[in-house]
Design a protein with these regions (language model features):
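Positively charged
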Residues: 1-126
């Protein structure tokens, strides 16, 4: 069974590298890139969450709950040509990058769901 996704981190396919790739269409805007050795260098105080929750290609079941994420992040790293890059992302793009970034540190989205209050609201939802 093939499932569609919008991001994939190297550890999800058994590759022990700090890299991930994303292809996300948000309205008329398309974000498509791969990044090596990414680092979140700054983030907003404002948080957000996906109202419908998050899913993951590594998790074959639905996990209910809100995952707190930063509304805006600045991500630095190296592109596929070996050039340094810095991306300023907000909203859904920022959420997806944080999800993939977590995989690099062995963190799953459900690890961030508050077990005592799984549907806690963090700022405004997306």
């Amino acid at each position: 069974d093939l499932r569609s996704g919008i991001g994939l981190a190297a550890p999800q396919i058994g590759v022990n590298k700090r890299m991930f790739a994303i292809r996300l269409q948000d309205g008329d805007d398309i974000l498509e890139f791969g990044i090596y050795n990414p680092k979140i260098v700054s983030h907003s105080v404002e948080q957000t969450y996906l109202a419908g929750g998050e899913g993951c290609l590594s998790v074959d079941r639905e996990v209910e709950g809100h995952v707190p994420r930063y509304m805006r992040i600045t991500l630095s790293g190296i592109d596929h040509n070996g050039n340094p890059v810095k991306l300023r992302l907000k909203g859904l793009k920022a959420v997806v990058c944080q999800h993939e970034y977590d995989h690099l540190d062995g963190i799953m989205f459900y690890d961030r769901i508050d077990p005592k209050e799984p549907f806690k609201e963090y700022g405004s939802s997306l």
